[in-house]
């Protein structure tokens, strides 16, 4: 199954993404339910991974949380998630990318770990509550990033308060991307007598 996350995660587009994820979740539940009643393994329906393509410069954190949590619901069913990043994978897009069990990207992809921004627009009591939520969300993203890469908290602290842009090579180095396995060429050595047998 496939899901495309393209553009900024804003209300209108993100509702469509969330609705698609709910439909995908229902379809997986249906397949898993059918497979649980199968007597012979040959009759089982193949459970394909969920391929998520991401081309996003970020978005609103509460939309990120909704989509990320729904991806985790699907993953908790035993479904493999494979994320693919192209072009730009920034902020909320990067967090969603980290949901992948396997993570791949185009070589020209630019990644960005975001120094989240807090807008102070309400009265003082609301500001305290909103800021506490902001800190909680920021801590969650930091935890997700650290758990799914080779990056330490100390390394992230070096970039605190500013956006951290990096490319494919550094993404591979820090464990953000799944290394692509290349099959080794096999060398076949045959004796002269085996060669003569083959030629006959």
Identify the role of each PLM range.
Residues 1-92, 98-200:
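N-terminal organellar transit peptides
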């Amino acid at each position: 199954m496939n899901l495309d996350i393209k553009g900024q995660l804003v209300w209108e587009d993100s509702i469509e993404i969330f609705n698609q994820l709910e439909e995908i979740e229902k379809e997986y539940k249906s397949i898993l339910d059918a497979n649980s009643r199968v007597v012979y393994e040959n009759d089982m329906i193949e459970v394909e991974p969920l391929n998520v393509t991401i081309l996003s410069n970020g978005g609103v954190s509460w939309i990120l949380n909704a989509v990320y949590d729904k991806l985790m619901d699907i993953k908790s069913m035993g479904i493999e998630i494979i994320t693919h990043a192209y072009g730009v994978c920034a902020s909320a897009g990067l967090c969603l990318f980290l949901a992948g069990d396997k993570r791949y990207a185009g070589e020209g992809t630019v990644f960005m770990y975001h120094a989240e921004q807090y807008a102070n627009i309400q009265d003082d009591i609301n500001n305290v509550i909103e800021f506490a939520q902001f800190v909680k969300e920021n801590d969650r993203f930091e935890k997700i990033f650290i758990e799914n890469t080779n990056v330490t908290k100390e390394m992230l602290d070096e970039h605190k308060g500013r956006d951290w842009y990096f490319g494919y090579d550094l993404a591979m180095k820090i464990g953000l991307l799944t290394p692509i396995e290349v099959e080794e060429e096999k060398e076949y050595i045959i004796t002269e007598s085996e060669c003569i047998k083959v030629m006959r």
